[in-house]
Amino acid sequence: MSHTEPKAPVNTGEVENGHLYDGSGTEDDPFIVEFQKDDPGNPMNWGQSRKWFIAAIATLSVFAVTFTSSAYSVSANEVFKDFDISTEVFIVGLSLFVLGFAIGPAVWANIGLRSELYGRQILWIITHIAMVAFLGGSAGSQNVATLLILRFFAGTFGGSPLVNSGGTIADLFPPAQRGLALTIYCVAPFLGPILGPIVGGFVSESVGWRWVQGVCVIFIGVVGILGIVFIPETYGPVLLQRRTHQLAKADGKIYVSVLEKNQGKKLPSEVFKRALFRPWIFLFLEPIVLIASVYMAIIYGTVYMFMGAMPIVYNEDRGWSVGIGGLAFLGIAVGIIFGLVYAIWDNNVRYMKLFAAKSANPESRLPPAIVGGVALPIGMFAFAWTNYPSIHWSVSIILSAPFGFGCVLVILPIMNYLIDTYTIYAASVLAAAAIFRSVVGAVFPLFTTQMYHNLGIHWASSIPAFLTLLCMPFPLIMYRYGEAVRMKCKYSFEAAEMMRKMQLQQTAAATTTEKDKDSSSE
């Protein structure tokens, strides 16, 4: 007669009574707490409408933050009058906000606000309150130093939704279902900076630059309140940890979460050390991560370069007003939307067929990036060389659309490629890419004005076009030789081996379960 381990009944109100946990409830053999099948405490088992509503709020937060970063860029003339500053000093206000996107996560690691330890909900509450406070203060600034410092701190806290919202979506949807949600989420950081100047231009022209900041405060504040009210904690490890505490308090026995059992209890110092140093290890020691990050950073930097370039091209050279000048971004915005539609179509028609046939590998993500890699320089060169007074203004705006189209089709597949390649290390890899592109996005606007005034519109716009042209072969090369390269890189090889072992374990477990069913039926 085989010995059967005692199991703990679940009675927390989060899962149905009758579900059982393995273990004995002792120090040597604690009950192992994990999500059960159809467990309502697992965010992945929530209703589709609820999950999509939460995902929409999380994505809207990313859009609001990036919208705020660029809406400021069209207020130059009014800020000049109020503070008597140069163009270069004004642009620092844009750059510092974007630089905060890179610095923010490192700061939180030091002060202990990490979602791995405390969950995502507390980060949402603290960072949105802080953004509203700092942006509200910047709207009332009486000198330029206060304006710049407060925008930097607003950007520092604004970096939280850029990282945390993607994690929230991953908490809600299993990999096979999260493609559409992540596609829309990944477009928000590019659509926000493009639409910010359009709205900001008309607000600045009508009621002044302080109300541009005020509108952003209201926008972020409303989104923050929506999140506080409607987004509960979604991070699985934290939810399981809370459940272990509830169960232990209820009956006095020993419970540990399945992750703590498998990985050990994480000390805050260990989490902080990993958060601070691991992204840099991947960035500088993994060629795939470095090249992909450089490519994405050039695109991201070019998006923010346009914040300084568009006023020169259309306001200075063509004499447009601040409000009308913001409409020049519509061409790129339309391109981004078309890129989103293409990405969704490609995922549903091509990639999901490969996934269903179990023939998808990380390189299967890259064909759209090959198309986008061609569209990027076409859009940039077309924008650069159709901006003559003799050519109608609509031509350059329309021809900037391929750049927006290419942004989505390069960034999204490359991010998915990095996730599929590094799997267990994906969070650190994406953090490395995000930090690098945020730094580049902060630097590009600093030299935009001088570059356009010294080189002229055509050659200044051609420089990022040449950079994207140099990067164009990367998706094609990785599509052809990516598997061989991955096997030669330390961490991508480790990730592949780990996933292979996990799949073997799952197969073995499934086989054992089938045998047990057959035995019991006999």
From Swiss-Prot:
GO-annotated molecular function: transmembrane transporter activity
Chief location of this protein within or outside the cell: membrane
GO cellular component: plasma membrane
Transmembrane portions of the chain: 52-72, 89-109, 121-141, 143-163, 183-203, 211-231, 280-300, 324-344, 366-386, 395-415, 427-447, 457-477
Keyword Repeat: no
UniProt subcellular location: Membrane
Function: Major facilitator-type transporter; part of the gene cluster that mediates the biosynthesis of sorbicillinoids, a diverse group of yellow secondary metabolites that restrict growth of competing pathogenic fungi but not of bacteria.
Name this protein carries in UniProt: Major facilitator-type transporter sorT
Native species: Penicillium rubens (strain ATCC 28089 / DSM 1075 / NRRL 1951 / Wisconsin 54-1255)
Name of the gene this protein is made from: sorT
